[in-house]
Amino acid sequence: GLSPMGANDVPAVDPAKGAEGERCGRLIVERVFAGDTARKYITRASLKNAAAAVSASGGSTNAVLHLTAIAIEAGVAFGVEDCNTACEDTAVICDLKPGGRFLASHLYASGGTRLVTQRLAESGKIVNAPTVSGRSLFAEAAEAEETPGQQVVTTIAAPISQRGSFAVIYGDIAPDGAVLKLSGHKVDRFEGPACVFVSEEDAFQAVQDGAVGEGDVIVIRYEGPRGGPGMREMLQVTAALKGRGIHDVALITDGRFSGASYGFVAGHVSPEAAAGGPIALIRDGDRITIDVTARRIDVAADLAARRASH
């Protein structure tokens, strides 16, 4: 509700972009003169709607960071588990890259986020809410125009993937949780030996040198908010793996991923290594298991003994 419906759909090079920018500017001025603030639109309901939309579009794991940060700033009770619940309840209905076939420009041509919102409203996955246009969310969605024959947006009844965009998982590696990307693959369980790195650059070089292979679990630590510092996106490594044709591999990190990241990846491992999290205790060769169904991420090692020895 905080972004005008369809405003972000318009491609950068589309002639309509300028007019869309002007529309947004006028809406901002109107809302200011009406005495509205962002908190009118940032509510628990609107944040749950946003999480459902992220899941439906196969969106980025970064949504967990952004939505919870917005909630904290707005003083709204909304957390990681709310994001998780939304993804468990909302199937992926957009066939978008990196896991699907189409680009954001194709989504725009097919009917855009207005069409996605309409699908979610019709299936009861979102609730009505006010928007900055002055009209309700459902009123905006009702004006969706689906392009005949489009293949980008399906329906909740016939989704691209039933299991949502991402999942929050826990385990002895991530007592406070990690976020596992689900869109773009059908892996339910992965087990393999750890290949441990203390920076994205080291991991990237190892992939380029052929030191990482099929069946491995790449562990990149000290890339969290404190350790990085700044929690960088581990896009280089996932891109390098794809470029070298290495598909049967997992990657876990206390850093984060770009929305363009591809593969079986779990980020935001918490506590991070720099805060003394268990990920700091993993060694090369440790057997790591990531179980989607059980929502677990564990390592076959006595981490307590290792911590005591330090």
What residue spans do the PLM features occupy?
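Catalytic or ion-coupling anion/metal-binding cores of large enzyme and transporter domains
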Residues: 1-310
